[in-house]
């Protein structure tokens, strides 16, 4: 997957002047959406606007002329439904182009990128078929080829860290312990086996409805690449489960969870929230890892100079935010939008109106406070262009390890005791605050690309499979989780032999 050098992203040293105009031939186009083999729910690529002197725009280009993109089947005889919304302006001279295919283009695609009447960069781009859509079940048999296509990183620090506790995985120990330790009526654990790229599962405990989210991402991954055979348990609850230390007897069990903590040993996967929004982007959800990049509100100079928070009452510090806001309205605008845990506080603190997430970015500073565990909004806040003030927390998600305080965000104490001080600092050090916000945004754009989520998932399953001490099996009570077999999944997979050849 072609990408611009990090230096170009971080500091476009030669920037176009205020009166410059976009040069279509000199502008750049890159990204996985220009590769046939990079199968994603929503395919996407980037445009960098460049002027006639070869200088990059670092803010939205002037004038009314917009980039226009047409994606169509290479063959006029092949009808393929493709949804192509307008390119998203990321307010930094770059644009994000998305398209969702509802059928496979067996002959291929033609992508035309225009600025005015002129073709951009090397447009038109020809993607030789087949170009598969999300629901085509056609996995790449060679995982190395698939990982190279998506430019998967050589390693993920959080994965390496998580597996230090598990040089070997004893499936027999897990089969004995997990049902008794975590599978009671209050449990939210699902037991999975993947064999021959088919997914089987059984539920343990009463609260396992969220298995729909683990099912959908595993099925999506299995449609793209052949998965290793393995047997594992996923925790669908909020809190990580395994608190045994490495030297304990018996030792810790490798439970897979969506959130980790400093005192637990769970293996972490990207949250169901980011995977579901990735799968349903441009269809069932409006707020996803791509759409937020083109909806970051006013430019930095025009944002309201206050810290901002809206959310449920899922942690007491959130109530403290509202009290601080009432006492310091010139620094902080905070409100609770729904009461469940502290219903008795609603009369005292009031209830704020719901507002669209993209409107959060009208404010210069975003306060990120834990909910029951790590706040699911954090990745989306980091993709905006506001400065994130992040509460110190024992909880973390899969990408936190790459983010550093004072480089990507501004830390605030667990008890919020220094929040107002940090807001004042940001107001008094505007350029430094802006720099931290931009550094955080660029790093989040890299860490939270949809291909990185798939790469991460695969790498966890691969590492786990390598450590199994015995063969995975389909256990009593397990059922097959089928791939979609309705009209949405129709395609001819070139990797599968025709049925006549198999007879």
Swiss-Prot record:
Motif (Prevents secretion from ER): 500-503
Gene Ontology MF annotations: EGF-domain serine glucosyltransferase activity; EGF-domain serine xylosyltransferase activity; UDP-glucosyltransferase activity; UDP-xylosyltransferase activity
InterPro entries: CAP10, Filamin/ABP280_repeat-like, Ig-like_fold, Ig_E-set, O-Glucosyltr/Glycosyltrsf_90
Reactions it catalyzes: L-seryl-[EGF-like domain protein] + UDP-alpha-D-glucose = 3-O-(beta-D-glucosyl)-L-seryl-[EGF-like domain protein] + UDP + H(+); L-seryl-[EGF-like domain protein] + UDP-alpha-D-xylose = 3-O-(beta-D-xylosyl)-L-seryl-[EGF-like domain protein] + UDP + H(+)
Name of a matching Pfam family: Glyco_transf_90
Signal peptide start and end residues: 1-19
Annotated metabolic or biological route of this protein: Protein modification; protein glycosylation
Main subcellular location of this protein, as a coarse class: endoplasmic reticulum
EC top class, as a word: transferase
Domain of life from the UniProt record: Eukaryota
Start-end of each Filamin repeat: 19-129
Family, similarity comment: Belongs to the KDELC family.
Name used for this protein in its record: Protein O-glucosyltransferase 3
Species in which this protein is naturally found: Mus musculus (Mouse)
């Amino acid at each position: 997957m072609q990408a611009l050098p990090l230096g170009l992203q971080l500091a476009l040293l030669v920037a176009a002047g205020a009166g410059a105009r976009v040069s279509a031939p000199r502008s750049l186009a890159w990204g996985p959406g220009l590769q046939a083999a990079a199968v994603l729910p929503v395919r996407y690529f980037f445009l960098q606007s460049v002027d006639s002197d070869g200088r990059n725009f670092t803010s939205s280009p002037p004038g009314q002329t917009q980039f226009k993109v047409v994606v169509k089947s290479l063959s006029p005889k092949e009808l393929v439904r493709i949804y192509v919304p307008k390119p998203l302006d990321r307010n930094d001279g770059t644009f994000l182009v998305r398209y969702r295919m509802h059928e496979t283009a067996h002959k291929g695609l033609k992508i035309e990128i225009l600025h005015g009447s002129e073709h951009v960069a090397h447009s038109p781009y020809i993607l030789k078929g087949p170009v598969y859509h999300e629901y085509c079940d056609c996995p790449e048999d060679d995982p190395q080829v698939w990982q190279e296509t998506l430019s998967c990183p050589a390693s993920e620090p959080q994965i390496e860290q998580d597996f230090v506790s598990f040089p070997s995985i004893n499936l027999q120990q897990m089969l004995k312990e997990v049902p008794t330790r975590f599978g009671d009526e209050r449990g939210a654990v699902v037991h999975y086996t993947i064999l021959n790229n088919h997914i089987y599962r059984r539920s343990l405990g009463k609260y396992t409805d969220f298995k729909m989210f683990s099912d959908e991402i595993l099925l999506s991954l299995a449609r793209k690449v052949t998965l290793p055979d393995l047997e594992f348990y996923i925790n669908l609850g909020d809190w990580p489960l395994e608190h045994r230390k490495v030297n304990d007897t018996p030792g810790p069990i490798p439970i897979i969870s969506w959130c980790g903590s400093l005192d637990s040993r769970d293996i972490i996967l990207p949250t169901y929230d980011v995977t579901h929004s990735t799968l349903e982007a441009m269809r069932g959800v409006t707020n996803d890892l791509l759409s937020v990049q083109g909806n970051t509100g006013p430019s930095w100079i025009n944002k309201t100079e206050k810290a901002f928070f809206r959310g449920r009452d899922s942690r007491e510090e959130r109530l403290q935010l509202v009290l601080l806001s009432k006492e310091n309205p010139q620094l902080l605008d905070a409100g609770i939008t729904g009461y469940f845990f502290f219903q008795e506080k609603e009369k005292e603190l009031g209830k704020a109106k719901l507002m669209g997430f993209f409107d959060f970015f009208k404010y210069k500073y975003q306060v990120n406070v834990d909910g029951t565990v790590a706040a699911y909004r954090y990745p989306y806040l980091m993709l905006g262009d506001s400065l994130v003030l992040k509460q110190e927390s024992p909880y973390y998600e899969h990408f936190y390890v790459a983010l550093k305080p004072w480089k990507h965000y501004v830390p605030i104490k667990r008890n919020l005791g220094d929040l107002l001080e940090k807001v004042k600092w940001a107001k008094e050090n505007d350029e430094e605050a802006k720099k931290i916000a931009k550094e955080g945004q660029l790093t989040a754009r890299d860490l939270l690309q949809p291909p990185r989520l798939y790469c991460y998932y695969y790498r966890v399953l691969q590492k786990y499979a390598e450590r199994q001490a015995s063969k995975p099996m389909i256990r009593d009570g397990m059922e097959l989780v089928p791939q979609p077999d309705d009209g949405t999944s129709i395609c001819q997979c070139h990797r599968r032999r025709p049925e006549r050849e198999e007879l």
